[in-house]
Amino acid sequence: MQFYTEYTLGLRGLGGKKADKGTITHKILEITALCKKAAQEGKAVIDDEDIGEVFTDNYEPEYLNSIGARVYEHYTQLFNYHTGKNAWRDRDFEDCLSWAWKALKYKDGMYDPRQRDVVDAEPHFDFEIEEDWAKYEYPEYNLSGHLALKGTIDLVSDLGDGVYEVVDWKTGMRKDWASGKEYNQNNLFNNPQLRMYHYACKRLYPEAHTFLMTIYFINTGGPFTVHYQDSDMKQTEEILRKRFEEIRDTDEPQILPRIRPKDCWKCRTMCHAGKTTFEGTNIEPLKEHRPGQRTKYGETMSKCEQVRYMIKLKGIDWVTKHYMAPGYTVGKYGSGGGKVQD
């Protein structure tokens, strides 16, 4: 249901503080990689779109700390919706900086971009899979084409001999939120995100024949690396096909309480559609009139409950047509890997 409300209807809320702190940490690490790549190209300065000029050859810890402070100032002004008891505090800055240093110092800088041959920092990919199985057509939305993959990769390094390594930084939990299971070395091999990165990297960097995909859980376990070769591409495409068909053929999205009842508390604490109602929007909010529902009788339904109710009443096509956020268009995305359209 969360996928449907966010990416089909465009109903997205503000980020939580933990996620926003992760964004800040990512940005600090991104700048170190951008500086290293620029230094490899003989450039002394980069002009970052968020914090301005940064020298590429200054590796002093104090300088990186100052970069972190500039990043933190920029994003806390951007993420100014954390107020009251949840307002930004000195401890938050200390967390962001310590997380970045933790990633950089691991095993004497094994994953420090400044000690690597950087191929790309934050490269974007956006392409269609031009296969028959990837076709879609929705005449009611004037929408047709092929499944498109779009995203952003944190870091790509050249290890030599046709081997590239992708590093994806994670500041959150080492957990698959879809299944509730913890990631480990065994189940990461078929991780959809890493598989998608491999598929994209073969397009971006055809000169490489082998890719190491490292997902680095900074605070919950460290780096985990899986190895993909050209021979894995067929299985990767099959995983993408099954996921695409599952989404395409869904008439009634599943909800967390039905999938994992013990995790249903997350609906009202972590999910925007579960925490908010349609009050104050262009959609008329509904009162709960059915006994035994998650929303108490007589209270305003959450967005999730109302969407689910209307799907049962009118069907998913009707809800998609009438509940889509103003200005939102299915199939359009913003400039970043995790953004819905700007």
Indicate where each model-derived feature is located.
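Mg2+/Mn2+-dependent nuclease catalytic core
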Residues: 123-242
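A non-catalytic, helix-rich entry segment at domain boundaries
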Residues: 28-135
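A residue-level signal for conserved active-site and pocket-lining positions in enzyme catalytic cores
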Residues: 25-26, 155, 213, 267
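Charged, glycine-rich intrinsically disordered N-terminal tails and low-complexity linkers that flank
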Residues: 1-59, 296, 311-342
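Metal-dependent nuclease catalytic regions and adjoining charged, substrate-binding loops involved
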Residues: 60, 186-189, 198-342
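Hydrophobic (often cysteine-bearing) scaffold residues that line and stabilize catalytic clefts
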Residues: 17, 21, 25, 92, ...
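Short coil/turn segments at secondary-structure boundaries
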Residues: 6-9, 113-123, 257-262
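Short amphipathic alpha-helical segments and their helix-coil junctions
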Residues: 1-13, 166, 174-180, 243-251
